[in-house]
Amino acid sequence: MQVTFLGTSSGVPTRARNVSAVALRLPQRSEMWLFDCGEGTQHQFLRSDLRLSQLRRVFITHMHGDHVFGLPGLLASLGLAGSSSAGVDLYGPDPLESYLNGVLRTSSTRIGYPLAVHRVRDAAEQGTLLFEDDDFTVRCTLLTHRVPAYAYRIEQKPLAGRFDIEKARELNIPPGPVYAQLKRGETVTLEDGRSIDGTSLCGEERPGVSVVYCTDTVFCEAAIELARGADLLIHESTFAHGEAEMAFQKQHSTSTMAAQTAAEAGVGQLVLTHLSPRYVLGNPVTPQDLLNEAKAIFPNTLLAKDFLSIDVKPRCNSS
């Protein structure tokens, strides 16, 4: 998995940062998922090496404009490009469907591909899976914000052990489609009548990786529980520690709240995003100060910037 930040500002865009959007690339299946879609997100796609045609799922955290105003235009552009024959699944708060229907109806916009909207509230309240397929699961939880806001956890299922090609050759197993079956751990009967157990040719199962996307929220236990043991936590950091009172009033997080969440959850790496536009040139407090505050609590912390990409592994690497 690879995460690419398309927008890292809170509230409004700045010259350097667009509003919230994070793309999750799944290269093994030529697929991409999007988390939040602030205004201008489709422009950010054009400035990146991401392929919008691979978009398959969109997860919206909450209905504030800096997280959702870009969605109608992006979906309309997908339709005009004719590149979404497989359809798009949307996940989000209860009002998401009525919001989209209203915008599309009043603008006479026709979506010419399958579009399904899934409400996430029940999965969050009941602690059940929001999504599952052969490779991934997605869970969500309700955060503490002024409107219903949800964090998402994407978990890759365990991966099959590495296939021992040399051993397969020693057993005179002919290469071809049968190798794919054996790699999946299946038992295969060869043309010569031998029955080969694929698990005997594979190493130990490898753990998958996990990503948690957590915004908007003030410090809360629900975020800690959802993020527990994750490889990568993407957490909002709207304010510096010195503005904690404002953070509580507006129900946003400070840099130190994000770091405390990461530390208590025992995650592998923390990335700060959703920075207030006040931290620009001329302000005595800078984004670097927020990063330093967080690293004092949780050293393995990065500061997101637009178009930063991170390969999600048990030990994350950024580029």
Curated annotation (Swiss-Prot):
Residues involved in Zn(2+) 2 binding: D66, H67, D216, H274
Pfam family, one: Lactamase_B
SUPFAM superfamilies, per database record: Metallo-hydrolase/oxidoreductase
Entry EC no(s): 3.1.26.11
Keyword Methyltransferase belongs to the record: no
Reaction equation(s) it catalyzes: Endonucleolytic cleavage of RNA, removing extra 3' nucleotides from tRNA precursor, generating 3' termini of tRNAs. A 3'-hydroxy group is left at the tRNA terminus and a 5'-phosphoryl group is left at the trailer molecule
Cofactor(s) for this UniProt protein: Zn(2+)
Entry keyword set: Endonuclease, Hydrolase, Metal-binding, Nuclease, tRNA processing, Zinc
UniProt GO MF annotations: 3'-tRNA processing endoribonuclease activity; zinc ion binding
Residues annotated as binding Zn(2+) 1: H62, H64, H145, D216
Annotated InterPro entries: Metallo-B-lactamas, RibonucZ/Hydroxyglut_hydro, RNase_Z/BN
Cofactor-binding details, from the entry: Binds 2 Zn(2+) ions.
Broad EC category: hydrolase
Active site: D66 (proton acceptor)
Alphabetical list of HAMAP family matching this protein: RNase_Z_BN
Its job: Zinc phosphodiesterase, which displays some tRNA 3'-processing endonuclease activity. Probably involved in tRNA maturation, by removing a 3'-trailer from precursor tRNA.
Family: Belongs to the RNase Z family.
Description of how the protein assembles with itself and partners: Homodimer.
Protein name: Ribonuclease Z
Organism of provenance: Synechococcus sp. (strain CC9605)
Gene transcribed to yield this protein: rnz
